[in-house]
Amino acid sequence: MNFQVSTRTLIQTQTRVRLAHLAVLVALVPFIWADYAVAQTAHDHNSPAKLVRLVRESTRQFLDVNAATEAGYGPFLGCVSGPDHGAMGIHYVNLGLYADGEIDVAHPEALIYEPWGDRRRLVGVEFLVDSATWLAGHNNTPPVLEGQVFQLVATPNRYNLPAFFELHVWAWRDNPAGAFVDWNNRVSCEGQ
């Protein structure tokens, strides 16, 4: 009898604990759903497609890397790759656009090319701005372009640069991880 009472008490206690957990979860659902709804409405669902389209329209002229160099873009740091998550490619940076401290969808600071022997294929762009310059002129808020918030690359960083904000847009090569993710596993530096 003692054994049965102990087992019954144990089962009742476990049941009460499970019911308490369930009650807490049910009570939190409205708050979790509200956070989810805010997160979903914080970005315009058309923005990714719109930003990719705008970038393609403004960079079509740079499909030929020679047009990029004629427009003031030049290779910076060689082909950037990661050990287990693809690559970024070769960044052709326009230092004049970087130095102006502004962001303009029609004038990305960097064009990203994938090397193929002595040729280059345009795969995306990177918008860049010095963080101190941007924050001083924009009420200490990070840049946002068509609903996409830029990432801060702090110092020290692998490029030995002062802190900067950046946003990749894979407009010319699909990225399974997303159009605005830094690394693209469909881009490679092996073709150099």
Spans of features found by a protein language model:
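N-terminal secretory signal peptides that target proteins for export/translocation
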Residues: 1-17
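Bacterial N-terminal signal peptides
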Residues: 21-31
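Boundary at the C-terminal end of the N-terminal hydrophobic targeting segment
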Residues: 34-39
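Primary mode marks residue(s) on the alpha4-beta5-alpha5 output face of response regulator receiver
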Residues: 40-192
